[in-house]
Each structure stands twice: as structure tokens, then as C-alpha cells.
A protein has these predicted regions:
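Conserved hydrophobic residues forming the short capping helix/wall of the S-adenosyl-L-methionine
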Residues: 45, 68, 145-146, 174, ...
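Conserved Class I S-adenosyl-L-methionine
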Residues: 5-9, 34-36, 158-256
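Class I SAM-dependent methyltransferase SAM/SAH-binding core
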Residues: 26-86, 95, 110
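A short SAM/SAH-binding and catalytic strip from SAM-dependent methyltransferases
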Residues: 94-109, 131
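Conserved class I S-adenosyl-L-methionine
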Residues: 124-151
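A short glycine-rich, Lys/Arg-flanked "PGG" loop and its adjoining helix->strand segment in the class I
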Residues: 109-124
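Conserved alpha-helix/loop element of class I SAM-dependent methyltransferases that forms part
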Residues: 6-25, 40
């Protein structure tokens, strides 16, 4: 649901700001999904620049490609590939961006080292991950599904939405990968939909792993669980009926 995803524009704008993108730059987006921050970066660097938007999901990239075409952006390429399997020549990019992706990777340290290699001298990395679960309101669906399926708590260190919610750990990983002048901070990401039902649709779109968890369950149970998820998002519903969630993301940046 792109309409709700557009609520993360502040998220994308922050990444572009941190990367200090200039007209004509070459940019790699790792985990670009429905097209952000790629499209924001493409507008910033202009037609002489180049953005390579990568994601593991061809379906999401198909939407991103349509959005780029609708916006008249001709400087974006799309590559469907796992973030840990990207292959580019060394020193191919002026900047690497990644929005809410790295925490899902089994080998974050190795991936950061490879991204460092893709950058030209003085090139910049700018990335975000989600903060701790209590300050990420869209995660209200997670404990509901875990309770209904009697899922055990994930073991420490396992990839997941909140696996990199420690800023100090992020800074350490970036420095170990070779990045200099590493800094971290936070940005508030707002997601809004017209109703709790629409918010559940949004979550199912952007977090397909939740649908996968329920995939083997009887249809009646799936419907019951999704209704409970919708009920959970009702706590964020305003008097106008709209659902408004505030979600803290942690950003970090560094240069080669």
C-alpha cells in the first residue's frame, strides 16, 4: 500500500540529507522495496545522476518501477537481488543508502564491508534501522501473531525487525567495516491510514513475513488473527477514524 508507505518520506529525506547527495552522483539503494529512498535520491541528483534500486522482492520492485515511470524519473535502475549477494565493481558509487533493511540480514558485518568496497573514496553510507520495539508502534501486530501461534521469543542475535536497535552496536559494526566519522541518531517515521483495516493491509504489504508465518494455518484462524491485529491498531485511531503511528528509526552514517 504505497499511500501509507509515503508517510515514510521524512525517512527517505533524512537518508538523502545524511548522504549529502550532489547533482550527478551515483547512488546504490540496498533494500529499496517500493522505491524509497531511491526515488527521493533520483530527484536530488538529477538526470545526470544514477540510482540503482535493489531489493530481494521482484514484486515490490515492479511497483517501484511504475512509481518511477509515473514520476518521469529516467535515472533509476532496478535490480532484484538479495542484499548479501550484490555484485558491483569496487568504487562504483558515491553513496550507499539503506532504509530499514540491514537488520534482516544474517551477515550484517560482511555486508557492510562489501558496501564499503562499492564506494568511491570519500563516498558515504547512510542507513536506518528500527529502534527498540516499544518505540515502534507499527509493531503492534507482532506480539498478537506471536501469542496466537505460541511462538517462542527469537534468540539473541537473530535477524529481525529490532535486531540492530542498539546505536552503539551499529556504530561499532560500521567502524569495523572501515567507515570513518561514524555518527548515529534517531528520526521519527509517521505512518497513517484511513482505518485500522487499511493499516493491517499496509502491514501485510510491507511485512510479508507475517503472512508467511500464518500461511500454514486454517483459513478461519488466519482471519481471526488478522482481525485481532486490526483491533490492536485501533488503539492508534483518532477521532476522525484515521490510524496514526509514530515509529522511531535509528540512523547511522559514515564515509570511506
Amino acid at each position: 500500500m504505497v499511500e501509507a508507505e509515503e508517510g515514510g518520506q521524512r525517512h527517505s529525506a533524512k537518508l538523502v540529507e545524511l548522504a549529502e547527495l550532489q547533482p550527478g552522483a551515483s547512488v546504490l539503494d540496498v533494500g529499496g522495496g517500493y522505491g524509497e529512498p531511491s526515488l527521493t535520491a533520483a530527484r536530488t541528483i538529477g538526470p545526470e545522476g544514477r540510482v540503482v534500486c535493489t531489493d530481494i522482492s521482484p514484486e515490490m520492485l515492479a511497483v517501484a518501477r511504475e512509481r518511477a515511470a509515473d514520476a518521469g524519473l529516467i535515472n533509476v535502475e532496478f535490480v532484484a537481488r538479495d542484499a548479501e549477494e550484490l555484485e558491483f565493481d569496487d568504487e562504483s558509487f558515491d553513496a550507499v543508502l539503506s532504509r530499514a533493511t540491514l537488520m534482516f540480514l544474517p551477515d550484517v558485518a560482511g555486508t557492510l564491508k562489501r558496501l564499503h568496497g562499492f564506494l568511491r573514496f570519500e563516498g558515504r553510507l547512510a542507513a536506518t534501522v528500527w529502534g527498540p520495539q516499544p518505540v515502534v508502534q507499527f509493531s503492534a501486530a507482532f506480539p498478537v501473531i506471536a501469542q496466537e501461534l505460541a511462538l517462542p521469543p527469537p534468540p539473541p542475535g537473530r535477524p529481525g525487525a529490532f535486531a540492530l536497535s542498539d546505536p552503539d552496536r551499529l556504530a561499532e559494526l560500521a567502524a569495523q567495516a572501515g567507515f570513518r566519522d561514524v555518527e548515529t541518531g534517531t528520526v521519527s517515521v509517521i505512518f497513517e491510514t484511513e482505518s485500522p483495516e487499511q493499516y493491517t493491509e499496509f502491514i501485510r504489504d510491507v511485512a510479508p513475513q507475517l503472512t508467511t508465518l500464518l500461511g500454514d494455518q486454517p483459513t478461519a484462524m488466519q482471519e481471526r488473527v488478522w482481525q485481532k491485529v486490526t483491533d490492536a491498531y485501533g488503539q492508534f485511531q483518532g477521532a476522525d477514524g484515521r490510524v496514526h503511528t509514530e515509529n522511531q528509526a535509528i540512523w547511522f552514517k559514515g564515509r570511506k
